[in-house]
Amino acid sequence: MNFVQENNHVLYLWAGTVGPEIEQEVNAIKTIPNVQVNVENVERLQLAEYGKSQFDVILAQVATGNSTLVTLLVKLLKPKGKCVFRDDSAASIEQARSNLLLAGFINIVASDSNVYVAEKPDYEVGSKSKLSFAKKSNVAAVWKLDDNEEEERIDDEELLDEDDKAKPTEESLRVCGTTGKRKACKDCSCGLAEELDAEAKGKALTDTSAAKSSCGSCYLGDAFRCATCPYLGMPAFKPGEKIVLTDTQMQADI
């Protein structure tokens, strides 16, 4: 009874028939001050309504190979509580130790008289703890802005000058023929390709300087032109500006 101390709550489990040695052991436990003892038959333990982590010490005449019962005893013990098994089976010390470890006991001590003392870990069965395996690195907050009112900031209104705000002219937007030699680009859309093609074929170009638009919106671009407008496909131009059209452009598609 060296495992029982003052103020302990003890569970005594017996198997078979009640003999005089059981009464002697229970009476010896009761002589320890402030000790509460519960005596229970092994076969009726699962029917008893004992709570989890209720006992400080359990004295059990239980075979360590009874995994169901051994696991139940782990739950009945308080953390760091001890359970003393008296195993009369033919199990070896190695086998008994393995059975107790698998049930959840630690610090198992065996004696030659088939008595095993096992301890419950210092935590409840089923408890969990968060494990952090990620290594934290000290990363500088590169994009963090300090709340400093004296810091110089760029005014977006100063990013553009008056020249940048000026509306570009048609000649400045014309890409073809800007290298000195009049040569149309591969995907010319400013009309130079048609102009050079007409000159190469010797075709006369139609002067539309005196032409008047019936809708008055031809110069705005294709989005504002009629379906039969001869200026379709040409860039926008200024009102009254001289525009040269080829013979093919003067013919309607339908």
From Swiss-Prot:
Alphabetically ordered keywords of this record: 2Fe-2S, 4Fe-4S, Cytoplasm, Iron, Iron-sulfur, Metal-binding, Mitochondrion
Domain of life: Eukaryota
Subcellular location: Cytoplasm; Mitochondrion intermembrane space
Cited InterPro entries: Anamorsin (IPR007785), Anamorsin_N_metazoan (IPR049011), CIAPIN1 (IPR046408), SAM-dependent_MTases_sf (IPR029063)
Annotated binding of [2Fe-2S] cluster, by residue: 176, 185, 188, 190
Ranges spanned by the short sequence motif Cx2C motif 2, renumbered to the chain: 226-229
A molecular function (GO) term: electron transfer activity
Binding positions ([4Fe-4S] cluster): 215, 218, 226, 229
Cofactor(s) of this protein: [2Fe-2S] cluster; [4Fe-4S] cluster
Principal location class: cytoplasm
Region of interest (Linker), residue spans: 134-165
Region (Fe-S binding site A): 176-190
One of the protein's GO biological processes: iron-sulfur cluster assembly
Biological role: Component of the cytosolic iron-sulfur (Fe-S) protein assembly (CIA) machinery. Required for the maturation of extramitochondrial Fe-S proteins. Part of an electron transfer chain functioning in an early step of cytosolic Fe-S biogenesis, facilitating the de novo assembly of a [4Fe-4S] cluster on the cytosolic Fe-S scaffold complex. Electrons are transferred from NADPH via a FAD- and FMN-containing diflavin oxidoreductase.
Quaternary data: Monomer.
Name under which the protein is recorded: Anamorsin homolog
Highest classification ranks of the organism: Eukaryota, Metazoa, Ecdysozoa, Arthropoda, Hexapoda
